[in-house]
Amino acid sequence: MIIFERILQMIVKVITSLNELLWGDLFILEFSNGETRFGISLLVIILIPAGIYFTCKTRFLPFRLFPEMVRVTLEKKSSNEKGSISGLQALIIATATRVGMGNLAGVVAAISFGGAGAVFWMWLSALIGSSSAFIESTLAQIYKEKDPLYGGFRGGPAYFMDRMRIITKVKREDIFVKDVHNEAEYVASDKQTYYTRGCKFTFLGLAFAFSGLLCWAGISQVVANSVTSSFKNAFGIPQLATTIVLVVMSALIVLRKNATVKVLDRVVPVMACAYFAITLFIILKNITYLPVVLNNIFSQAFGLKPIVGGGLGAVVMNGVKRGLFSNEAGSGSAPCAAAAAEVSHPVKQGLIQSLGVFIDTLVICSCSAFIMLLAPGEAIEGLVGMDLLQAAMNYHMGKFGVV
């Protein structure tokens, strides 16, 4: 038992150190008033500039082609490849990976520490992150491989990091091609001067796979902990009992061949639509307060009050961090689902996953934000995390909302 406790303590220390490195304040910007501070984390430095670069490089493609996103999402599979999935199924799987504690407790934390103005910066991070999602998912499609175990395709950042070479001269219209597995055939068919240099990035692929394993294992534990805590607070069910049920249900899904897609294909749309419908009901029920909530979101994002009070940095950084954590644009999880899709062109899956970022942050995160902001202060005073969101739901819809 002592050895087990020491191992757990060591794991906690490692995770805490990594969290501080990635999400902690790498450096702090202070303005002339001495009170307004921006704590800039490493991931914000990497993901936000990358998102802006991709947005400009693609000429604001996710915004220009938004109607096309919806159209290609509804397309059927381009072939009957056994084990492959459609673009819509890939979107559902990616949405299942995105939607979680970032959309619930993460939104609550952003508003608790950054105020209503943090919601605006979450929206902005989604608009920027959609371009990153487009690029990473398109690359996953280009470098996907046949899955010998389950059929269909598999891929993701670890695959294209391992196989991708630095391309120094390719025509713009040839950046996204259906198949670049055979470089010689591609060059010969297009009569294109094609230069590559360097070697495969095998080390980066392995590093990503290892870090992804640690990350997603930790995220699963966070979600499970929040679920067990919620059931304990709402119904008094012991956390161990809920944990056992979750483990059994997860095993039944994961260990059965191709069961994950089938289950998510049914559960995710129902849960997302139900959550959206509940939020719409709450908004209509409190429609007279909606202008006040919207005014608070924009005024606290840009107004003089947070600037003078020194809270602007907290508003911006909490909104941006929680937005990035929620939509996972740039984290590399969604491309794994994108690679499994069977589409006629890689860009189509890039567009579909960009739409997934919009759904995650602009729709589902906004639902959580409005549920919380439309609840009076006395109903949620002194609460944090899921307890706060449950209290807000209890105020709006009684015990049914808590469920």
Report residues per predicted region.
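N-terminal alpha-helical transmembrane segments of multi-pass membrane transport
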Residues: 1-101, 111-118, 129
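Transmembrane alpha-helical segments and their short flanking loops
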Residues: 2-24, 116, 144-149, 163, ...
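Select transmembrane alpha-helical segments in multipass membrane proteins
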Residues: 44-50, 85-94, 197-214, 243-244, ...
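Membrane-interface loop-to-helix entry segments
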Residues: 46, 54-70, 204, 208, ...
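Helix-loop-helix module between adjacent transmembrane segments
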Residues: 53-55, 96, 125-153, 158, ...
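Alpha-helical membrane segments and immediately flanking helix-loop junctions
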Residues: 80-113, 139-142, 149-164, 203, ...
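Selective recognition of specific alpha-helical transmembrane segments in multi-pass small-molecule
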Residues: 128-136, 239-257, 268-288, 321-324, ...
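Extracellular/periplasmic helix-exit of transmembrane alpha-helices
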Residues: 136-145, 280-296, 304, 310, ...
